[in-house]
Amino acid sequence: MFCFIDIACYNRLTMTQKKLRKYAVVDLEATGAGPNASIIQVGIVIIQGNKIIDSYETDVNPHESLDEHIVHLTGITDKQLAKAPDFGQVAHHIYQLIEDCIFVAHNVKFDANLLAEQLFLEGCELRTPRIDTVELSQVFYPCLEKYSLGALAESLNIELTDAHTAIADARATAQLFIKLKAKISSLPKEVLETILTFADNLLFESYLLIEEAYQEADFVNPKEYYFWQGLVLKKEKAVGKPKKLSSDFQVNMALLGMDARPKQVVFADLVKAHFNDQTTTFLEAQPGLGKTYGYLLPLLDQSQKQQIIVSVPTKILQDQIMAKEIKHIQELFHIPCHSIKGPRNYLKLDAFYKSLQVQDRNRLINRFKMQLLVWLTETTTGDLDEIKQKQRLESYFDQLKHDGEVTQSSLFYDLDFWKRSYDKVAQSQLVIINHAYFLERVQDDKDFAKGKVLVFDEAQKLVLGLENFSRGQLDISHQLQVIQKIIDSSIPLLQKRLLESIFYELSHAVELFYRHNSFEFSETWLKRLKNSINALEVVGLDELQTFFTATYTNYWFETDKVNEKRLTILRGAREDFLKFSKFLPPTKKTYMISATLQISPKVYLSDLLGGFSSISTEKIAHEKNANQKVWIDTSMPNILDLSPEQYAYEIAKRLQDIMTLKQPTLVLLTSKQTMFMVSDYLDKWEIKHLTQDKNGLAYNVKKRFDRGESNLLLGTGSFWEGVDFVHRDRLIEVITRLPFDTPKDYFIQKLSQSLTKEGKNFFYDYSLPMTVLKLKQALGRTTRREEQKSAVIILDSRLVIKSYGQTIMHSLGRDFEISKEKINKVLTEMAKFLI
């Protein structure tokens, strides 16, 4: 008998009868992920009226041996399947169970196609509508980082035992589906109406769930939302009247439901004791002490008239403090607090509104529009960092980022997220900011920090932030292509002429650089170019405009090669960044909190921050990090005695040995050329690995590494400073070379001359201390959780044979146990340490 159901008939007879509408949530386990896979297990859960009314599970004999990774993934064995029925024996029962249902699955394309094909071979044609819970989750849970079934189960408190067995996954998907239905039904009718205009871009018939919810949805509740120009935005809840904190730190901690730790109490008392003195206070305290509460609580008690500004190294840490410590404090004490970032972190409502007026050819962009419509009903900040997967369509989000301009003519002037964030600073007793934006903000607006209480958390990273702030780069090759593309588009004549002038100035400068191996950036030339750039009104040239609005004192060209393609890089820098004390306006009080105050025997953190006129210093005794150990490979030849090829070979050989430990391994290199040469050796030896800029950009290769696609990752640049590895409980970190600045670097040469004029030794007063800070920052990349263990091996024998090596090891030795051994002994010790 040939079984057949027509989808149009199905829609008429069943879909319009809500009480009878049934959903079959299906999960299959198979011999592989390809189209020729065979089913080995079926799990089905039937839902009607938001309740599970039936379920079914069976093993299926594929009559073939399972691959080892399938056995490992599912726990299903050949012996188990040998007793199972053939698919033909269960096919008609499965068909009868789901024929009048909407087919639901997590990644429905795989499950529905495979099941439909197998049913067809048994004479049953399955043509029911399909709903994909992956894509619906991406739209209606817009702030999650991962959308695998396991990740969603963890985020949404869904029970998932025996993952990767069909019935367990089907039950978890059924619970997810019920939660999705409830979430969609809770949204205002106006939101669902706009979403439905883009819903055809969803996979298969996923829009049916939205249509069903729309029929019974409530209109916007003005107490909860703003409704303006078709957009629904969440209103922020009013904060209660602030409560006074106790002057006793331990009492405040008890009120928050926590016990104060002894060293935390000492730290808090030191913060309080120095509040009224006129010094810049440097406090040394190791991570894990609980220092965030240790400075927030005493300062909120002491500083009731002056605003407190806390600057932290990264936006991620900024978000973490807001979500944890500050949220806790706000809930109890109702203190007005605010987190502010640069304008480009915020959604510009005008730009998003404009993008909603058109259907994009790229269906994923239209899906992100739906996602953002949902997000606007949840966010009160408009901070795009809340959208964790925006990197997938960065070009679209670049169009939506705020430019910092807010005019009265804006449709969303009163609701503009950047304006609201900017204005909220003045109303807050406590402001959280990151080092990079603090520097940018204070450069333009000294009053932002004037007379305030400042706290720089992890102040040692402020030094590195100052160095980055003082320097910038622009890929001129790429910018010229972008400019030409805009010139060729339909833009006003005046803008076209400005762009043609900019294109000529830059391309002519590049031509002269290659002809004479230099180019003089005269004041006249720079002024002429900047005037043209400032007059631009076209979009798409943010990088160009940002670079030329920075206050650099030096400019120069460099060349680089990526995938055999020559790039021309324009760099800019300023030499006064080491005078941070002069950069700051007068403050009520400034605290510098760091895990490291003494960088080297002669250099302290206060020296690198520009010599404050009056400082006080306090240290809290700290212990070494038991979860991280450092090894120096004494068998590594002296780098300076090796050719580039020999050096790459020595690194690659050690990586080959390290991979025998079967642990995730991060390799930090200081040169792209060396990185690619090492990668070539690994390819030659058929060692699976990922390489930045060869297998993808930094963000993408890290994501693949975190997913476990490879246990070996080679990286440079941002991997030293801004990328954390939190997903692996055990990790090996290989530092191939001490991160000294390149002596040939134009800026480094200028800085060396400047420090020499001041009577300082460039190497010992700047270069060596900065290298120590960069090393410690790199070590911190792999210890982001208490239960995380990492083994670090440094392949630079200069630590042993050079006199300054002792200085570096002395500094590292205060925080980590260090061992100096030959590579074979290192591998043995590392294996034991990582058990």
List the predicted regions and their residue ranges.
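Acidic, Mg2+-coordinating catalytic module of metal-dependent nucleases/exonucleases
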Residues: I102-K109, N113-Q118, S148-E211, V792-I794
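A contiguous, basic/glycine-rich beta-loop/short-helix subdomain that forms a polymer-engagement track
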Residues: E405-A426, D445, N534-L642, T716
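Walker A/P-loop
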Residues: N276-L297
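Conserved RecA-like P-loop NTPase helicase motor core
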Residues: S635-S643, L697-D796
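A substrate-engagement module of RecA-like helicase motors
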Residues: D248-Q250, Q306, K315-S428
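Acidic two-metal-ion nuclease catalytic site recognized across multiple nuclease folds
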Residues: F2-K18, K179-F249
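Signature of the SF2 helicase/ATPase Hel1-core->accessory helical subdomain module
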Residues: G404-L430, H435-N534, L597-L609, K744
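Conserved non-catalytic scaffold segment of RNase H-like nuclease domains
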Residues: R12, T16-T128, P142-L160, H164
